[in-house]
Amino acid sequence: MNAYKITFTPKTYIDYNDDTIEPIWNYLGCLYKNGQILKNYELVENKDGLWALITLPDGEALKPENNNIYVNKYLAAVKEHFNVSSEFLGRNMNHDESCSCQEPSWYMLYTDWMLSESPIVCGDCGKAVPLYKLPHILQSDEHYGVLGWQAAYKSTDILWTYCLSDRFTFRQMHDPKSQLSMDGISICKAFEEKIGKPFFYYLFNNERTKKMCPICDSDWKIYGEKTFVDYKCETCRLVADKTSKRGVIVNTEPIIKKGRV
């Protein structure tokens, strides 16, 4: 992924107070909620103005055609007081490259406590798909609902990783009928309706996954085919690994390698 700097240069002398700075924070927040930047953005003051240090999922993310109505609204407010420009700084080595497939044949909803990339994974290359490339769902003009689910999942995963409320947190990630899973499955269904491509939900398991789908009880093990998941139920739109490859805090390398690797 790419590190960028957005420079906000005051058009005239201004005080950096809530009235002048808040539109910048709103602009950055809307870029994040639309999937155009990652959440690790920072605003820095210097002698010539303000810098926003941001991470983009790809080089196209800041193009005006990718903005939603909220990004455009707050960018216009920012430009009342500032000239705005962006500069490529280099590759952010903390993150893998995003999916560049033209038309993925299927998608997967997946995240864990280590990941800050998009929770939408391309089923062909196994890399994260920038959210701004996907249609808005759940009667929203941004992707905040998807990002909210991701935040809830990551919080649950952190609690489970540190052995807190084990039974509750494990069930939330493992049971397709838990509230967290049902929310995720609803997101998958909404995307599939909009995109017209299969959208699968990833089920976590810290032990060997059973050979039968937990919903329809059919054999969902993948035989022979090379893929980055071991189980896949086309009917129930679920995927899983033999054993989920996380849960021990020894390495922060994203799981999305395995294709996801």
Predicted features, each with a name:
Residues S178-V261:
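Cys/His-clustered metal-coordination modules, chiefly Zn-binding fingers
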Residues F170-P176:
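Surface-exposed cleft-lining segments at the edges of enzyme active sites
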Residues M1-F170:
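Domain-scale terminal segments
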